[in-house]
């Protein structure tokens, strides 16, 4: 858990510099042990799509594959 959070924190510091990233942070789940949530806000869908396939994200997936035991991605649009 600690190794994962440390690696994720480093990854997030890079994401914060990406075009279109308005907010990203890590939250510890208070009801489920060893579970974290990452909350991201992107300026638009194309920016998020570009983030998901850039070299930094590919490198993260290589690191995370040995540390993550489940992942759910939910994409939401803000209501007017």
Give residue spans per PLM region.
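An amphipathic, aromatic/His-enriched active-site/gating alpha helix that lines ligand/cofactor pockets
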Residues: 10, 14-22, 41-75
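Short, surface-exposed ligand-recognition loops at beta-strand->loop->(often short) alpha-helix junctions
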Residues: 1-4
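A structural signal for the hydrophobic beta-strands that form the central parallel beta-sheet
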Residues: 23-26, 38
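Short hydrophobic/aromatic patches at helix-to-coil boundaries
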Residues: 76-80
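Residues on conserved beta-strands of the protein kinase catalytic domain
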Residues: 34-36
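Short beta-strand micro-motifs enriched in acidic
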Residues: 27-31
